[in-house]
Regions:
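Terminal signal-anchor or tail-anchor transmembrane helices
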Residues: 2-30
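Generic detector of intrinsically disordered, low-complexity, polar/charged segments
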Residues: 6, 18, 83, 105-106, ...
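Hydrophobic ligand-binding cavity/cleft-lining segments
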Residues: 23-122
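Short, ordered beta-strand-loop transition motifs
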Residues: 54-57, 137-143, 163-168
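Residues in well-ordered beta-strands of folded domains
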Residues: 65, 138, 148, 161
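Mature, function-bearing regions of proteins
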Residues: 74-76, 110-120, 125-145, 151-154
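Beta-strand/loop substructures that line and gate deep hydrophobic ligand-binding cavities in soluble
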Residues: 151-170
Length: 170
């Protein structure tokens, strides 16, 4: 009975801990459907990497509202860059980054990839930036950074966009 209780406790802990961590980490985030009628699906970048105009398999949007007084700057490009720096150097990418580094970093041709947390935190995320042998920046504007899976260019686009709205009127 002691073994069964320990196994049950271990199963609960390994299931509940990540679930509770995800809930805490995304507590101020709302996930909403991303309409397939969005002009993003017909952009030059989307047409380049999806020439067959295939429908998206997974398209959602994570929305987080941050009060203006919590921002250190109001410059759109700086906010977008800091947003990317926070995503890729933060805890959400930590385990995957370590796994990818252990598996692929020693292979040839990967000297220019961002592997270290400090590099991810200081990068400007310009077009051509490669992240841990897995992502590559293919489009960059002041308000967004588009990435693809660096090893499979047809796997879909990831868009990180920051919309700066000084006043939302209802």
């Amino acid at each position: 009975m002691g073994l069964l209780a320990r196994l049950t406790g271990a199963a609960f802990a390994t299931t509940a801990t990540p679930a509770l961590g995800w809930m805490w980490y995304t507590r101020a985030t709302t996930f909403v459907p991303f309409p397939t009628s969005s002009p993003d699906f017909s952009s030059a970048t989307a047409r380049k990497f999806n020439p067959g105009n295939n429908p998206p398999v997974c398209n959602d949007m994570a929305v987080r509202t941050v009060p203006l007084d919590q921002l250190k700057t109001t410059d759109q490009e700086t906010l977008t860059r800091q947003f990317c720096q926070g995503i890729w150097s933060g805890p959400g990418f930590e385990i995957q980054r370590r796994y990818l580094a252990r598996k692929y970093r020693q292979l040839g041709g990967r000297w220019d990839h961002l592997w270290e947390k400090a590099d991810l935190k200081s990068s400007r995320y310009n077009v051509g930036t490669k992240i841990a042998d897995h992502f590559e920046v293919v489009e960059r504007t002041d308000e967004k950074v588009c990435l693809i899976n660096a090893g499979n260019k047809s796997s879909g686009l990831i868009e990180i966009r920051l919309l700066y709205d000084a006043a939302t009127l209802h």
